[in-house]
Structure formats: C-alpha cells, structure tokens
C-alpha cells in the first residue's frame, strides 16, 4: 500500500478494495459473456428458469466480491506481493478442498439400504448411516459451510446440492468481516 499524505488509511483501503472489485467484476462479466456466446451456439438450452439464472448470477457476483475482499485482506497482511500471491493460492486451494470434503459429509443420507443375508436369502434392510453427521458436529459443518465462499462456489457449481436460500446474506457477512478486519489491520500497521 502506498500511503498518500492527507488521506486516511480507511479511504485508501476502500479505494484499493473498490478498484479490485471493479477489476474482478470486469473479468467475471467477460467470462460470462464468452460462456453465453459459446452456450448459445454449442449447448442445449438451460432447464433453469430466468429467475434461477438471475439468482445464480447475483450469487456469482457476490462470490467474486467475497473472494476479492479476502484477497484484499491478505494483501494488507503481507507486504511482499509474491508472498501474498503464494499464500492466497494456498488458502484458496485449501478452502476449496475443505469445502468439498464438508459438502460430501453433509450430503450423506441419514439412512442407507444395506443387504443382509438371512435364512430366506438376501434381504434389503434400511439402517442408520454411520457417516451421517449429527448434533454439534453437523451444526459446525453447516455454519462453516454456509460462511466460506469456497463452499458457496461448490454449491453454485452443483446447482443447489444443499439449500442456498441464505447464501447471499452469508456472502455479505463474510465480505463485511474481511473488510473490517483489513481496515483495522491497516490502521494499526506500522508503515515505513
């Protein structure tokens, strides 16, 4: 960050954030335009309603803003740009793997069909799934899964494997938390 005399650090942080958000959204819209053109000519029409497509588009825009907020926070934490890029890549990869694993655990059914051999031959029996998460562990997985942008990205790509009703609120909360932390760190940071 370059501190310009006469400007508060909060304004500098927010201007950097807004610039990054605009750049991220420009990349997103370019990508969406290319996919739209490609899809019109080479893919079948979508089975989703217009409302669902608009909702997913808004979620993807908020997802871009959430990741941009996270990357801006990381840029404040580390002065070295190369280190920031490496750490950002590792964090995004780690969050993606963590989110994927959490979603897989949350998708487990509560009951499963199990073949049991009896005197009359094989019988199909419904039993409780030992992999199904319950209690506090399930709540922790659900809350973490709802807040992390990488989990939201997995859910959007799966087209609503798990309920996405509150996704927009969680992304706004995540964005606000990242920005508040980033602003407070920049305000306390000793600069040369």
Regions found by a protein language model. Name each.
Residues 14-83, 87-88, 103-104, 122, ...:
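Secretory targeting signals
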Residues 93-188, 192:
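Terminal transmembrane helical anchor/hairpin motif
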Residues 7, 78-79, 189:
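Membrane-helix interface residues
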Residues 1, 74-75, 170:
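Residue-level marker of motif borders
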Residues 1-17:
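Interfacial "coupling" helices/loops that link adjacent transmembrane helices in transporter permeases
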